[in-house]
Amino acid sequence: MSEKEKSQLSELSTLGIKFYEEKLKPILEPEHIGEFIAIEPYLERYFIDENSTKVALKALAELPDRKFYFARIGYKYAY
């Protein structure tokens, strides 16, 4: 992975966390605790599912050319 790609992934993660903490956390917790979320922070789009594979497939079906930040709602780590 090139330095540019690493930088882009770092930016994606930073923006994904910021979007979740500032805008999504208050509206998603506690109703969706434990579910997985795929976030496209530049478009401020997100997808939720109880299954990590299904949430990835939903996100890619809607936005096939985008990259996503993945998390588990209400948890520090997805696994």
Predicted regions: what they are:
Residues M1-E31:
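Short N-terminal "domain-start" leader segments
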Residues E5, L12, I73, A78-Y79:
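Short, charged, surface-exposed hinge/linker loops at domain edges
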Residues I33-Y75:
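Amphipathic, hydrophobic secondary-structure cores in small proteins
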